[in-house]
Amino acid sequence: MPKSYTELYFPILLQAVIAMGLAAGLLTVSYLLGKKVRNRVKDMPYESGIVPTGDARHRFSVKFYLVGMLFILFDIEAIFLYPWVVVYRDLSRNGSLFGFYEMLTFVILILSGFFYIWKKGALDWGEPTARPGRK
């Protein structure tokens, strides 16, 4: 006999309540017991243990943004592979290779996009050098 949704999801709800309660409790104890000393050193921004110097308003090369966008693009495409991997056994159980060919097409499109941006030089950081076959 199947259990009700309340019985099925009660452990998850209990875990969430315990996690939030533990986090709130630890933050409260830290706030109540911690010292409240404010000085110039504590008010400085922390940057990997290095004392910050200069102004934070510098121009960044567009290549940083390009690489960031390409990373997000290919990362999301890699995330789309995960559900396919999970259900692949069910897709191929009846002997059909449709799911395999569908994902093979998807991977070929991803790789062709990757080779296209590589060929266009979107991943080159240095000054362009004279390479054979490249203008």
Swiss-Prot record:
Source taxon at top rank: Bacteria
Gene3D superfamilies to which the protein is assigned, alphabetical: NADH:ubiquinone/plastoquinone oxidoreductase, chain 3
UniProt record similarity statement: Belongs to the complex I subunit 3 family.
Keyword Lipoprotein: no
Enzymatic reactions: a quinone + NADH + 5 H(+)(in) = a quinol + NAD(+) + 4 H(+)(out)
Cellular-component GO terms for this entry: NADH dehydrogenase complex; plasma membrane
Top-level enzyme category: translocase
Organism of origin: Solibacter usitatus (strain Ellin6076)
E.C. number(s) listed in UniProt: 7.1.1.-
Record-level Gene Ontology MF annotations: NADH dehydrogenase (ubiquinone) activity; NADH:ubiquinone reductase (non-electrogenic) activity; quinone binding
Transmembrane segments: 9-29, 67-87, 97-117
Function: NDH-1 shuttles electrons from NADH, via FMN and iron-sulfur (Fe-S) centers, to quinones in the respiratory chain. The immediate electron acceptor for the enzyme in this species is believed to be ubiquinone. Couples the redox reaction to proton translocation (for every two electrons transferred, four hydrogen ions are translocated across the cytoplasmic membrane), and thus conserves the redox energy in a proton gradient.
Gene: nuoA
Pfam families: Oxidored_q4
Membrane-topology annotation of the record: Multi-pass membrane protein
Quaternary assembly: NDH-1 is composed of 14 different subunits. Subunits NuoA, H, J, K, L, M, N constitute the membrane sector of the complex.
Compartments, record wording: Cell inner membrane
UniProt keyword annotation of Phosphoprotein present: no
Protein name: NADH-quinone oxidoreductase subunit A
Key words, A-Z: Cell inner membrane, Cell membrane, Membrane, NAD, Quinone, Translocase, Transmembrane, Transmembrane helix, Transport, Ubiquinone
Segment forming the signal sequence: none
